[in-house]
Design a protein with these regions (language model features):
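Short helix-terminating capping/connector loops at secondary-structure junctions
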Residues: 53-55, 90-96
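Domain-level recognition of nuclease-like catalytic cores that cleave nucleotide substrates
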Residues: 95-163
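Metal-dependent nuclease catalytic cores in nucleic-acid-processing enzymes
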Residues: 78-92
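Aromatic/acidic cage segments in peptide-binding pockets
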Residues: 74-82, 116-122
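Amphipathic alpha-helical protein-protein interaction segments
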Residues: 35-38, 53, 67-74, 121, ...
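Active-site metal-binding core of divalent-cation-utilizing nuclease and nuclease-like domains
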Residues: 1-59
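Short beta-strand-loop-alpha-helix junction that forms the active-site gateway
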Residues: 42-45, 56, 61-76, 102-104
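Residues that form ligand- and interface-recognition hot spots within folded domains
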Residues: 49-51, 62-66, 85, 101-106, ...
Length: 163
């Protein structure tokens, strides 16, 4: 998630806000600013596009499932934020929830590539293919790290994976 957040943050236009459930990247106790909705929910990434009236809010949820669980993961994430999305719409904003699944072996299917393309377009990310490859590689490396640590009694703080 850190790589996706930093890519979006580095490329975004000035009137687009990007928040993430990462240290130093959220507001208060949420990734949704209070002027949008008072909530303790923390979508992985929240995009607020103020180029339009009303502002457009995009809630992004990133999941790393097994390939066989990709559709179930998307359904779970959509359902998890359905009430928040509806509350934001009721408050007068446009809102959509976009679940993104990068399979634990690094595969990104066409639906997720399309969703990422939409997010990248909004944030004006130019290096689409490079970012997709990096997300895929990070998923695979992260899964491999978890696998190698499966018999460990404790987790040590490990430096962030670099694509």
């Amino acid at each position: 998630m850190a790589h996706l957040y930093s890519t979006l943050k580095e490329n975004k236009p000035d009137n687009l806000e990007v928040y993430a459930d990462l240290e130093g990247a959220f507001i208060g106790s949420s990734t949704v600013p209070v002027e949008i909705m008072l909530t303790n929910s923390r979508p992985d990434i929240t995009l607020i596009d103020r180029r339009h009236e009303p502002a457009s809010v995009t809630l992004v949820e990133l999941t790393i499932p097994f390939t066989s669980g990709i559709n179930a993961a998307a359904d779970r994430k959509r359902a998890r934020y359905e009430f928040l999305s509806n509350d934001i719409k009721d408050a007068g904003f446009q809102c959509q929830t976009i679940p993104i699944e990068v399979c634990s072996r690094g595969h990104i299917n066409s639906r997720n590539r399309s969703s990422l393309a939409s997010i990248f377009h909004t944030c004006q990310v130019k290096k689409y293919q490079q970012t997709i490859k990096s997300l895929s590689k990070l998923s695979l490396l992260g899964s491999y790290t978890v696998y190698n640590s499966r018999n460990s009694d404790s987790w040590n703080i490990v430096s962030l994976l670099k694509p």
